[in-house]
């Protein structure tokens, strides 16, 4: 992927680069949101079947783990920073490591496992969601950072909207499959994945031009094969 992005940047077409960046970003966010929705709804029941309810995490730690997974899956700026050759930012990994370790130790002391995970998340938010996109926009794209903030805010609103619609659907329309064994759990999981995947796909397709371009590109490449 880094090589492909590097070739695109070498062409020097800023509009094309930004268009691909938005497609790449929104597609990663959509995929991460679907995966995390399924993790949130299905992990506890799977662990109960696998090792028993005694090994379930507390709700706070579990939610923080899902948030961490989402952040880890949506770090789209790193590939473009590498492709632009912006290697002068040597202090970001050091600051991230210091924040990660320091916050995890302090918060872990007071809040246990939830504090440790929270410390990791805070360090990622500062560096991966704060500094790195700012660095990319100012030194790579050479555009105002507020454009990134507005676009990510729009994506997060679409994720929240899709989550709300899916929650209402599961609460009032479809109660799911009764999970008394692992076979029923698999059927239930596939249903949850399919339903939320379709709902979120429709929300993203309706409200985001870059996501529509990504879908058209995907089917175009699929038809070529």
What is the predicted function of each stretch?
Residues 141-144, 168-225:
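Membrane-proximal transmembrane or re-entrant/amphipathic helices at the cytosolic face
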Residues 23, 36, 45, 69, ...:
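Residue-level recognition of pore/gate-forming positions within transmembrane alpha-helices
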Residues 1-25, 29, 79-83:
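Helix-loop junctions and terminal segments of transmembrane helices
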Residues 66-95, 105, 110:
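Membrane-interface junctions at transmembrane-helix termini in multi-pass inner-membrane proteins
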Residues 27-39, 114-138, 152, 156, ...:
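Short alpha-helical transmembrane segments in multi-pass integral membrane proteins
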Residues 101-106, 158-175:
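Hydrophobic alpha-helical transmembrane segments in multi-pass integral membrane proteins
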Residues 22, 39-72, 141, 177-183:
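Interfacial segments at transmembrane-helix termini and the short loops linking adjacent helices
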Residues 76-85, 133-149:
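Alpha-helical transmembrane segments
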């Amino acid at each position: 992927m880094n090589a492909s992005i590097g070739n695109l940047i070498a062409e020097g077409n800023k509009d094309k680069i930004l268009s691909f960046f938005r497609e790449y970003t929104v597609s990663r966010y959509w995929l991460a949101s679907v995966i995390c929705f399924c993790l949130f709804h299905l992990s506890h029941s799977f662990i109960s079947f696998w090792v028993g309810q005694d090994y379930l995490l507390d709700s706070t730690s579990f939610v923080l783990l899902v948030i961490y997974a989402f952040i880890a899956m949506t770090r789209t700026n790193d590939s473009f920073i590498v492709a632009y050759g912006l290697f002068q930012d040597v202090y970001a990994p050091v600051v991230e490591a210091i924040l990660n370790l320091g916050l995890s130790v302090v918060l872990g002391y007071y809040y246990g496992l939830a504090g440790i995970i929270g410390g990791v998340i805070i360090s990622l938010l500062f560096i991966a969601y704060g500094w790195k996109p700012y660095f990319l926009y100012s030194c790579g794209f050479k555009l105002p950072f507020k454009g990134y903030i507005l676009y990510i805010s729009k994506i997060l609103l679409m994720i929240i909207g899709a989550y709300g619609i899916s929650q209402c659907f599961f609460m009032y329309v479809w109660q799911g499959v009764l999970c008394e064994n692992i076979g029923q759990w698999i059927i239930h999981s596939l249903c949850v994945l399919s339903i939320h995947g379709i709902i979120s796909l429709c929300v993203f397709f309706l409200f985001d031009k870059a996501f529509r371009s990504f879908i058209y590109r995907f089917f175009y490449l699929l038809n070529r094969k």
